[in-house]
Amino acid sequence: MSLSSSIEWTESTWNPLTGCTKISEGCENCYAERLTRRLQAMGNPNYANGFKLTLHRHVLEYPLRWRKPQTIFVNSMSDLFHKDVPDEFILDTFKIMKQAGWHRFQILTKRSERLLKLNKVISWSPNIWMGVSVENQDCTFRIDHLRTTNAVTKFLSLEPLLGPLPNLDLSGIDWVIVGGESGPKSRPMNPSWVVDIRKQCQAATVPFFFKQWGGQNKKKTGRILDGEIWDEMPIAKEIQGFRKRSLVAGVGFEPTTFGL
């Protein structure tokens, strides 16, 4: 778990599981796999198994120890809905998020079929934002699955954007993130794809967040689109009283860095 994240749309990360397997084109140049190799070489004990799917039960209760409210990206180094993650572990993760109601949790998955299957038994709460990753037209079915869930806030991560996404159905969607692929083998993103998605979001009054152009040097390419930085966020749907009550009831200590 890391207190400070370099991901532009979140504040912290929490990884009760690490490692994954590839299921679609967006996985080809997985940043988490590259980072895992580095962390393993550094001797980080959570990455002793490399990129093999690994559950870290000792990490589950970390959010309960963070007193200060945080926006937390869940499983930045894996996918909570991977087929090899036991149902019980997934449900326990959601229970912790509900209990830690003073935080806001952001979850992304490419495995929307399993999300849909578990939807009715998940302990949803307003502080849990659920999202799906969609890299091209072939993966837009994930949006339909997400729309069917009982998540209060639903969002899309269109990263790495590998093709145009015309005629998106944004009904029931609260937020859209767009980003290009970064890294040594990154595939290019056409600016016209980004502009079109932004226009669709504006027409549907859905907040639009442009994360990056990507490429081999993402800092150099930046995140300016048409002369602006697009940092739009959804209106928080959390019940403030719920968050305050949870903070009073929470136990723990001031946040610190627990590692990835």
Q: What does each model-identified segment do?
A:
Residues 1-73, 79:
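N-terminal [4Fe-4S]-dependent radical SAM core
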Residues 1-18, 22, 39-42, 162, ...:
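Auxiliary Fe-S-binding modules of radical SAM enzymes
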Residues 26, 31, 47, 89-91, ...:
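General N-terminal targeting signals
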Residues 27, 36, 107-109, 140, ...:
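Intrinsically disordered, low-complexity sequence elements enriched in Ser/Thr/Gly/Pro
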Residues 41, 48-51, 95, 118, ...:
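Short, surface-exposed, charged/polar-biased interaction segments
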Residues 55-209:
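Conserved AdoMet/S-adenosylmethionine-binding subsite of the radical SAM
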Residues 257-258:
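Short, intrinsically disordered C-terminal tails of secreted or membrane-associated proteins
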